[in-house]
């Protein structure tokens, strides 16, 4: 180790914390601060030159100039200090720098609201996540994916450290899950505390409804619903799902007994014009839910019955046509097919001669035994032979397509033509 330069007349003494050395360095001495310097074990002070005057500075007041891993992390993080032990360092949240103490309180309030009695009974996603764990824990990684939590922070360790300070929540031993400290109380079903009111009076303001229904018990809330007004005011928006299409109101009581009393005492069906219609919401909603599937089933049965009827009718018509064709070609008595035309055949072949002739010709092809007695014994009876349709092309009117050449045989030469040739 090189010794420091001494002033004239000074003696070399052992260094101590209280000792100071002049801050002048030789002009030819060069200090390389680009490389890490070894810690000063033997000298606790070193010279620094600010001006021509000699200034003595205590080493304990000067920070260590040797770079460390924390310094490099500081540069990589653009000056953000991630030391979380003191809670004084600001953290950037959604583009805004927030002190870490304030951020911790925001995280605690937000997660406590997720697990609160106000939100949890209506949060189906969080309830299902709690049911997956026997102890009711929810992964903190799941909580961190919520929209409002993303705005606060995405640092998992920061969320864990904040939730540990909560008096309402408990963090698991592995610091990966969180749950309520006290179990969730029995969920209150608002339907059993609420009555549905229809046929409202002309003055159906909130105050008047409270005055009328307050006689049955303590009222928690009153909501008046006008589907027509909502439809006009929310054009193009999402419509609310009302269980009634007319003006109605919901009155929620503090107790079930008060709701039942209101339904029993304030319901007036005798006065069909001005009387109130009061029912428990649970009963009204149940009837409404049962009515809708019943209508769907009726419509489904109608469609099914119509299709079955069409199929049955089509099959019947098809069988009838097949039966008629079968009788037409294989019946022993052709007069049966013509109903009352049998007497006309006796008196002189009246009726549809062509159709009868076809059947007679078809039936009499083997000689005897298939025609009727009256027709076969008639003196003027001549069976009509139906010529087969000649092959060849046909014109649209049914005539043959060619008069000469193809499609028609050349007539034989007459006697005059033969004699002339000779």
UniProtKB/Swiss-Prot annotation:
Residues 193-283 form the RRM domain. GO terms for cellular component: nucleus; ribonucleoprotein complex. Residues 48-61 have a biased composition (Low complexity). The lineage of its organism: Eukaryota, Viridiplantae, Streptophyta, Embryophyta, Tracheophyta. This is La-related protein 6A. It comes from the Eukaryota. It comes from Arabidopsis thaliana. Residues 73-89, 295-348 have a biased composition (Basic and acidic residues). Keywords: Nucleus, RNA-binding, Transcription, Transcription regulation.
């Amino acid at each position: 180790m090189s010794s420091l330069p001494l002033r004239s007349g000074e003696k070399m003494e052992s260094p101590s914390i209280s000792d100071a050395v002049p801050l002048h360095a030789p002009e030819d001495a060069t200090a390389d601060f680009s490389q890490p310097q070894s810690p000063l074990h033997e000298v606790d002070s070193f010279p620094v030159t600010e001006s021509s005057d000699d200034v003595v500075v205590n080493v304990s007041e000067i920070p260590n100039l040797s770079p460390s891993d924390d310094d490099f992390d500081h540069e990589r993080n653009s000056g953000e200090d991630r030391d979380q032990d003191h809670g004084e360092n600001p953290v950037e949240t959604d583009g805004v720098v927030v002190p870490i103490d304030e951020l911790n309180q925001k995280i605690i309030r937000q997660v406590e609201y997720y697990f609160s009695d106000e939100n949890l009974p209506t949060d189906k996603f969080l309830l299902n996540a709690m049911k997956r764990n026997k102890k009711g824990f929810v992964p903190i990684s799941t909580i961190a994916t919520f929209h409002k939590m993303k705005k606060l922070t995405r640092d998992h360790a920061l969320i864990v450290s904040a939730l540990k300070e909560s008096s309402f929540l408990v963090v698991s031993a592995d610091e990966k899950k969180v749950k309520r400290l006290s179990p969730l109380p029995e969920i209150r079903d608002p339907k059993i505390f609420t009555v549905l009111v229809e046929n409202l009076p002309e003055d159906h303001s909130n105050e008047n409804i409270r005055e009328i229904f307050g006689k049955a018990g303590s009222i928690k809330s009153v909501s008046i619903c006008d589907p027509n007004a909502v439809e006009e005011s929310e054009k193009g928006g999402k419509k609310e799902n009302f269980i009634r299409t007319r003006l109605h109101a919901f009155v929620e009581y503090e107790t079930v007994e008060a709701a039942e009393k209101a339904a029993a005492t304030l319901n007036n069906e005798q006065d069909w014009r001005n009387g109130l219609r009061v029912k428990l919401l649970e009963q009204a909603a149940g009837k409404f839910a049962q009515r809708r599937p019943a209508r769907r089933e009726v419509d489904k049965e109608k469609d099914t019955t119509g299709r079955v009827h069409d199929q049955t009718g089509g099959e019947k018509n098809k069988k009838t046509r097949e039966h008629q064709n079968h009788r037409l070609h294989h019946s022993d008595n052709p007069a049966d097919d013509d109903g009352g035309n049998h007497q006309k055949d006796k008196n002189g072949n009246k009726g549809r001669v062509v159709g009868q002739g076809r059947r007679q010709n078809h039936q009499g092809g083997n000689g005897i035994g298939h025609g009727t007695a009256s027709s076969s014994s008639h003196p003027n009876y001549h069976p009509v032979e139906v010529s087969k349709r000649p092959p060849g092309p046909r014109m649209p009117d049914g005539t043959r397509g060619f008069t000469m050449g193809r499609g028609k045989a050349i007539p034989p030469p007459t006697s005059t033509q033969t004699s002339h040739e000779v």
